[in-house]
A protein has these predicted regions:
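Amphipathic alpha-helical segments used for helix-helix packing
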Residues: 93-113, 164-168
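Amphipathic alpha-helical packing segments from all-alpha helical-bundle domains
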Residues: 62-69, 113-139, 149-153, 178
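Basic, helix-initiating cap at the start of DNA-binding domains
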Residues: 1-21, 26-34, 51
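Short, hydrophobic secondary-structure boundary micro-motifs
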Residues: 101-103, 116, 144-145, 175
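C-terminal peripheral helix-coil segments that are non-catalytic and often amphipathic
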Residues: 84, 88-91, 127, 131-139, ...
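Hydrophobic alpha-helical connector segments
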Residues: 55, 70-95, 148-155, 177
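Short hydrophobic/aromatic patch on the recognition helix
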Residues: 36-46
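Alpha-helical DNA-contacting segments of helix-turn-helix folds
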Residues: 53-60
Length: 194
């Protein structure tokens, strides 16, 4: 019988193993060892290594998106929502470096994963930004000539580059809160109305 606890244990172990070894170098036996389960147990829950990676994205990133939406929705001001989004995004690199490493490295290397997730989870995540921009435009806070699709990618790109820097650095070179504020302020200066 499948156990939700064992499933979660395997996912957590996979995040660590994929971050340490990379998806292509990791083996099912590495994940089983890290999860303290038999190799065969993995196959009760997942068809193969790629299935585990997909589950990591579905479950772990799904949780992160839900948390981000919840935090953003607690704010009234579109400007504050942008700041909250930036801080939550950058905080992931500090709070869950292994997951941040997987997002930074594996999402870019696996063409199959990119095809599947560019259209779903990734879009859902960056669409939070475009929804904030549209809300600000409706309230005449943000310029009407700003295209939300372009702006969301520019903002995400700045955050993504800082996350990549932190993932590749042994020690974060900048303070996360200060960086989130600085990126948010630069972005908001570009899209604020009048």
């Amino acid at each position: 019988m499948k156990s939700p606890d064992k499933h979660e244990k395997i996912i957590r172990a996979a995040v660590k193993v994929f971050a340490k070894k990379g998806f292509f170098s990791a083996r099912i036996s590495d994940i089983a060892k890290a999860a303290k389960v038999a190799d065969g147990t993995i196959y009760l829950y997942f068809n193969n290594k790629f299935d585990i990676l997909i589950s990591v994205f579905d479950e772990e990133i799904g949780k992160f998106i839900s948390q981000t939406k919840k935090l953003v929705d607690q704010e009234e001001s579109p400007q504050k929502k942008i700041e909250v989004f930036a801080l939550k995004h950058l905080s992931m690199a500090k709070e869950n470096k292994s997951l941040a490493e997987i997002i930074q490295m594996e999402l870019r290397q696996s063409h199959k994963l990119i095809k599947e997730y560019r259209k779903t989870i990734f879009s859902e995540y960056v669409d939070i930004i475009s929804a904030i921009i549209r809300q600000g435009q409706e309230k005449d806070i943000f310029r009407k000539d700003v295209k939300p699709g372009v702006a969301k990618r520019a903002f995400f790109g700045a955050l993504d580059e800082m996350t990549r820097l932190w993932v590749l650095s042994p020690k974060p070179p900048y303070d996360i809160e200060d960086t989130a504020k600085q990126i948010s302020n630069m972005f908001l200066q570009g899209i604020n109305a009048g």
